[in-house]
Amino acid sequence: DKAESRGLGDVYKRQVPEVDAKISIFDSAVLLGDTVTESTRTFNFKPFKLDEHLERLYKSFKLTRIDPQMTIEEMKKVSLELLEIYKDNYKANEDCWLVHNISRGHSITGGNPALQVSKPTVMIYTQPMNLVLWAPFYTKGCHAVTPPTRMVPSQSLDARIKNRSRLFYTLAEIEAKLVDPDAQSVILDIHGNVAENKGGNIFMIKDGKLITPTTANCLEGLTRNSTMEIARSLDIEVIEAVIQSYDLATSDEMFITSTPYSIMPATKFNGMPIADGNVGPITKKLILSLIHI
C-alpha cells in the first residue's frame, strides 16, 4: 500500500512500512520524551542542508549524553539510502520530510539514566511535505499571537538542543489557535521577551534592518541562519537582539522562518495589523532569494 510505504528505517537497516514500525512501551522516548530530533526537507527530492541538520543532531547527542552508536557518516549514509529506497513512492514534483528521532533506548524505572542500558532507538522516516495549510500565508500573511504558555528557560533546558519534549510548544500552539484557528504562536520567555514559534524563528523589519532574537532562548534554526546570510548578501543590516511584543507590534514587517515553509509572512500581531497589514517588500525579496539558493 503506497500510503503505508513512505518509509521508516532504523540503525540496523531494517526498512519497514509505517504500520509495522514499533518501539517498546518502555522506551525512553515513550516514558520520558527522552529523544533528540532533526527534520530535513527536500527540494526536487534532494535533502536541503542535511549535513548541517546532522551536525546539529550530533551536538544534541553530546549535550544529552545519548550514544547513537553510529558515526555521523553512517547516519548520513543510512538516511540517503532510505530516501533512495522510497523515492519511487513519491510523485515527480513531490517533496518530503526526512525525520530523525533518536532516543536513549530502553528505560528502567528508578534506574540510572547516565547508564545507557540498551542500544539507542534510531528512527528515520520519510513523510510527504504537505504545504497546503501554509500556502495562503505567502500572499495574505499569518496572524501571530502570543499565548500564555512561556518558553522553558534555557537554564532548565538549552533551547539549542532540538528534542521531542514538546508539550509546552503544543500547549502554546493550542492557546494561539483558540484565539484564531489560523494563528501562529509567538512564544515569549518568562521575562516577556520574544523567544520563538513552536517550530520556527521570529523576525521583524524595522527601518530597513532585519532583527531577530538572540539564541539565548531559541533554537538556532538553519533556515534562520540562511535568511540572515541572504539578508547580508542583499546589504540588509542584521541585528540579533532582545525584542518584546511591543517591538513586533510596531515593526514595519514580520515573518517566521522554518524548514518546511522557509519564510512565512505575518501581517497581523495579537489582532493588530503590522504596518499596513500587507506582506512587506523586504519579506518578499527574502522569500524570492531563499527560493533560489
Positions of the model-derived regions?
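Single conserved hydrophobic/aromatic residue that forms the stacking wall/gate
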Residues: 1-12, 291-292
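N-terminal basic/disordered segments at the start of proteins
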Residues: 10, 14-16, 21-22
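A residue-level signal for conserved active-site and pocket-lining positions in enzyme catalytic cores
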Residues: 13, 33, 57, 100, ...
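N-terminal cap/recognition module
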Residues: 19-61
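N-terminal nucleophile
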Residues: 22-37, 103, 124, 177-290
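Short histidine-centered catalytic/ligand-binding loop motif
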Residues: 43, 58-71, 157-163, 211-218
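Adenylate-forming
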Residues: 57, 292-293
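Extended Lys/Arg-rich, glycine-bearing segments that form polyanion-binding/interaction patches
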Residues: 74-180, 275-278, 282-290
